[in-house]
């Protein structure tokens, strides 16, 4: 059993992990961006440390800051929650190199399944039925062409997304055109990966 676990996340998932850790008699360590100082996950934790000001990339996704806090405060495990660094194999390897347990999948499992487009390719190779879709798309015009071939509505998806973040239903070419930059930007800010692809969307499936 661990003695002290850092929760590398915020919001509802961080409060749920904190509640479970307290039930198990394990100290919960919260981290927070300055803008989240008054958040519930901060006040509920046994210890809480500020990651500074700035975007998610500068705070919750800043591995150097997180590792420094873990080592400084004697953390022996980290729970990533969902989103953020939860599917980042480099973060897991960094934890392992420092003797800090990562509560989650291995780097190898993440490399295989952490990116939706690679998981989709693996599923195709093994004969799993899938909705029509694309590989990674880097060009908006290619995305618009692919969507026309697949047929609207489609879902524009972040390959690295998690927790429902980085998905946008596009009913037509205009909505896909508008969603393209925003979904990629959201993905880059939350997952440090702006890769996107398209799948056919089935309403009320």
Predicted regions and their residues:
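N-terminal beta-alpha lobe that positions the nucleotide/phosphoryl donor
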Residues: 1-205
């Amino acid at each position: 059993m661990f003695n002290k676990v850092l929760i590398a996340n915020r919001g509802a998932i961080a409060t749920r992990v904190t509640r479970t850790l307290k039930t198990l008699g394990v100290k919960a360590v919260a981290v927070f961006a300055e803008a989240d100082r008054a958040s519930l996950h901060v006040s509920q934790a046994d210890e809480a440390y500020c990651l500074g000001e700035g975007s998610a990339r500068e705070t919750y996704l800043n591995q150097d800051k997180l590792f420094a806090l873990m080592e400084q405060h004697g953390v022996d495990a980290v729970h990533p929650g969902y989103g953020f660094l939860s599917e980042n194999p480099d973060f897991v390897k960094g934890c392992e190199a420092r003797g800090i347990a990562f509560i989650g999948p291995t780097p190898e499992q993440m490399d295989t399944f952490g990116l939706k487009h690679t998981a989709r390719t693996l599923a195709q190779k093994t004969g799993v039925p899938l909705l029509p879709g694309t590989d990674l798309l880097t060009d908006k015009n290619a995305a618009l062409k692919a969507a026309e071939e697949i047929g609207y509505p489609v879902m524009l998806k972040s390959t690295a997304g998690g927790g429902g973040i980085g998905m946008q239903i596009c009913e037509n070419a205009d909505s896909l055109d508008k969603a393209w930059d925003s979904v990629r930007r959201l993905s880059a800010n939350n997952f440090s990966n702006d890769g996107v692809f398209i799948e056919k969307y089935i309403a009320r499936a």
